C-alpha cells in the first residue's frame, strides 16, 4: 500500500479483554496484536536517569512484568478503567500502527449486551480525545460470522473476558436469544493456577498468572469424554507433558491439561451456577423462531481465542447432537484463524462500499452527542 492510499484507510481495532487486535481495513490480518495490559512499577526507581515511565502498555508491560503490577482495563468485555483504556488506544494509534487517528475513520468492537454507557463513552473518547473523523461500534460475534463468509448462523464467541452465543439471521443479531456467559479465558487461567497449586506449584502474582496463561495455551485440550480421559490419566502417564518455567524449573502436568478447559462445559468446576457452552448454545437456538433453527444448527461458528483448544469442535458436535432433535444436521465450523476472526470481519465490513454510509461522522456527533451511537450502530 502506498502512503497516498493509506491516508484515508479505515482503522479496525478489536479491543478484547485479553488482547488488542488492530490494523487497517482491507488487510487480511491485524498488524498489531498486543496484550490489553497497563503496568505500573511496584517499587520506587533507584537508577537515576533511567528514564523510568510511570506506566507501560502491552508487550512492554509484559516483558517488564517482574517489576510491575499489571492491570487489565477491560473486564468481562466491559471497559472498567477509562484512563488506562485511553493509554491503550493511544499506544495502538501512535506506537503500534503509527497513524494519526484524526485522519482515519475507526471501527471499534464490543461485546453484545454491553451497558449503553460503555458504548457512549467509547464514542466520546474517540471523537473528543483522538479527534477521529468518523467511527462505528460493531458487535464482535457478528463480525466473526462475516469473516466465515456467512450471514446466518449462531456464533459461539469465547475470548478472555466474556463468552457469548449470538444467533444471527440474514445479518441481523437476534437480541432476545443472545446468551452471555461471564466465563472465559481469564477464568480458565485462574482455575489452572488453582489446580496447579493443589499439585504443589505456587503461582500467585500478576506476573506468574501470565506464565500459567502460557501453559494453558500450549498444553491444554478438551477431552471428548471427560470421565474416560480422567481414567486414562489416572492409570497411565501417557497424557503427561512437561513445561519449563522461566527460571529453568521443569513442571509436569497431567489431567490438569483437560480439567482446565472442561470448565467451559461444566462451569460448576469453578463454582458457577451456569450452563456449559454447549447448553447455552442449545438454549439460544431454542429461543429463536422454529423456522430458522435448522439453519442455526447447521452453522455453528466458533470464534475467539478460548475456542482454540484442540478437541473443542468435536466435543461441541457431540454435546449439541445429544441435545438436538435426532434428525437434525449439526455442523460446527471452527476456522483455523478464529483467534482473529472478529478483527477479520471488521476489516471486511469497514472496506465494503455499502458500509461507507454507516459511519458516525464527527459532524453527526457534534450535532447529536454520544447517544448517536445507539441510533447508528445496532
UniProtKB/Swiss-Prot annotation:
Disulfide bonds: none annotated. It catalyses: ATP + H2O = ADP + phosphate + H(+). SMART domains: ACTIN. One of its GO terms (cellular component) is cytoplasm. PROSITE patterns: ACTINS_1 (PS00406), ACTINS_2 (PS00432), ACTINS_ACT_LIKE (PS01132). It is found in: Cytoplasm, Cytoskeleton. It is an enzyme of class 3 (hydrolase). Its EC number is 3.6.4.-. The keyword Nucleotide-binding applies. It comes from the Eukaryota. GO terms for molecular function: ATP binding; hydrolase activity. CDD domains: ASKHA_NBD_actin. Keywords: ATP-binding, Cytoplasm, Cytoskeleton, Hydrolase, Muscle protein, Nucleotide-binding. The keyword Zinc-finger does not apply. InterPro entries: Actin, Actin/actin-like_CS, Actin_CS, ATPase_NBD. Belongs to the actin family. Actins are highly conserved proteins that are involved in various types of cell motility and are ubiquitously expressed in all eukaryotic cells. PANTHER family: ACTIN (PTHR11937). This is Actin, muscle.
